[in-house]
């Protein structure tokens, strides 16, 4: 092992500069400052911060970050000590503790290697894949446990389908009401023409009144269309603007999420590599030279986690607002639809109740003369019977003699 050599191995900083400093942290009620430590004797020449936990003194102060090297505690050097010994040194101090460190001036772009990019692609593929399928394909991955946002995304998709169905149904309903209103208008026009041409005043007035009722129903239908049409606009706004905007935010969130999970997977792989070398008793070059590559990935993971947490917070807030708008909007739209249709049917009922003109008495003989002036004159049944009796009792003129003499009674004689 490198620790058994008589000379020191120079640290391989990968061109990453460090800046020394110190920070005083006030411990919490559990006598902790909120950091985890890695490295140290006997395999690594330096100790460094692996993770800064949320809502702890170190996280709230924001001075130290993952990957920073710890050089001393309260003015005491920790060179050559193990991480367990350094943790005890920090725990022994009550109240405030001063941490001396070398700040790692890392560029996150330097940690975005081809390996991280490929891991992002793999996580994107595995996202919609079951665990059994991923395990069968041998795809290692990092997942978020108890991710409640997944259920929210499923609810968003169901809400989008609901609004899509309501939009289509409302369109069909408006189209049907428009055709119905045009039918009522046609009825009104027909009965109006009949009323104008009806010679009897009572029947004419009844037909005109019935025609006006249908025209009023047509106006009620147009008013219903004008009232419900904004509902369709609001539904389309929610469906085509609000939901796509949320999906775009979710798409950005997923990109940040996959990047964070990729760094988590990379850290896990590097930890496994280090543990394997320790188990075999073989020194690992990057560990023996300061483990700067690992510390760079730790810093990138911390920054990716910060972006992920912020983006997740934004997505949850946007989805919460979207849910509130959905609950309020759907109630308002349905109330508008129900109240408008109720008013439409009540108005139609009132108009038709006042237009109860049936039965209508119509003089068909007079009406026939009025409508058929160019036709043959109408004769009733009694006149037809008299003509039939005459034809049966008296011969026709054609059957009589052309110049037959008259008998004593003045009738024609057969020739």
From Swiss-Prot:
BP term (GO), one: regulation of Arp2/3 complex-mediated actin nucleation
Tissue specificity statement from the Swiss-Prot or TrEMBL entry: Ubiquitous.
Keyword Cytoplasm assigned: yes
Pfam families found in the cross-reference section: Arfaptin, PDZ
Main location: cytoplasm
Lipid positions (S-palmitoyl cysteine): 413
PROSITE patterns named in the record: AH, PDZ
Domain PDZ: 22-105
Gene3D superfamilies: 2.30.42.10, Arfaptin homology (AH) domain/BAR domain
Residues bearing the modification Phosphothreonine: 82
Renumbered residue ranges of the record's region Disordered: 376-415
Protein location: Cytoplasm, Perinuclear region; Membrane; Postsynaptic density; Synapse, Synaptosome
PTM comment: Phosphorylation at Thr-82 appears to inhibit the interaction with AMPA receptors.
PANTHER family: ARFAPTIN-RELATED, PRKCA-BINDING PROTEIN
Its biological purpose: Probable adapter protein that bind to and organize the subcellular localization of a variety of membrane proteins containing some PDZ recognition sequence. Involved in the clustering of various receptors, possibly by acting at the receptor internalization level. Plays a role in synaptic plasticity by regulating the trafficking and internalization of AMPA receptors. May be regulated upon PRKCA activation. May regulate ASIC1/ASIC3 channel.
Name this polypeptide is given: PRKCA-binding protein
